[in-house]
Amino acid sequence: MPEKKNKPELLAPAGNFEKLEIAIHYGADAVYLAGKDFSLRNFSGNFTDSELATAIRIAHAAHVKVYLACNIYSRNHEQLQLKDYLEKVGRLRPDAIIISDPGIILLASEIIPHIDIHLSTQANTTNFNTVRFWQKLNITRVNLARELSLNEIKTIVENTEMETEAFIHGAMCISYSGRCLLSNFLTHRDSNRGLCSHPCRWKYAVVEELRPNEFHPVEEDSRGTYMFNSKDLCMIDHIPELVDAGISSLKIEGRMKGINYLASVVKTYRNAIDAYAADSETYAVKEEWRKELFQVFHRAYCTGFYFGNSEEQSPNYGNSHQGKIHSFIGKILKCYGENRYLVEIRNKINIRDRVEILSPTGPALESDIVDLSTPDQTPVENAQPNTQAIIGLAHSFFPNDIIRKIDSKQPVTDS
């Protein structure tokens, strides 16, 4: 029976190699990723078979576990292809495979019995008897339904011998754990086949059939409204409750999010979990953690269903995106002498710009760009997107640290 109140695993998304490196750099204990087929995030980049092998080697070398998503609901014509794919998974040897379809669970149990099976949140697990049922089918972990309260999760943990996993940060679906047909209806993209176009995030208005050119906002608000637009989940203020509930793994949503978002969120929850594990008696949420999460690209935050607050669960009726105005500059590729760094530039930067650098530990540090040059060390006044540049900073940093420009007039970016 698993320990109920041990330090939980921090599980982060890894939609491609760059995101994998960032998740590892900022402290994830495990990552979830996918191949090119049979995943619910076909637009996140994902990995070819050979890339999966490399990704697993990279993660395992850093003592980070890898969970491979195979969480679509499959059709008859895919069964032979699924068998071939599962045989490949067996050779790749991820730490677990994430599945929702009982038919794929059956195949995986037969073809790759040496690989742990984690049940996807798409399976809508909401009570301890359901967990017991899945355990009899060789499931080793259940990603619980997002619709559960913290007290309900505690009851499940106390009445089962299964590892549990729960989302703690990121986008939430307006439908029951992703069972939605809006995307199918409006764009002919199947949300349960990895092709969701997120129409719940679109801006809608009411049109009266005899006045086709008159658009009326659903709420009396000059900005209109987002009829289905869920707030984002954020549980940074409730790490003690999550840990004390005995949840085995705390999961961050976002395989399609950029590395600026990923670095910020993984770092923040890593720091919070470690702080609570080190001294639960004097633990307190740091304002710098809240600040970090509030300055990345996000919708209004809430605690979802964890505390049963209907207002918290309500749609986001304001702007779809919030966050501090800053520009993501790029990431450090390597050190280039004392306090000089080769940087992959994502947004324009000028010499003497004020920037902040996010490292895995401690708060973000500010610095001026004290010198700027091309990779062949030719001095320049600015560096353009999709180039590399050598920049001089006032402090010591490391490869994969994230750089952001302060007080930019550009909107928050996340790529």
Where are these regions (language model features)?
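Aromatic- and glycine-enriched glycan-recognition loops and surfaces
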Residues: 44-53
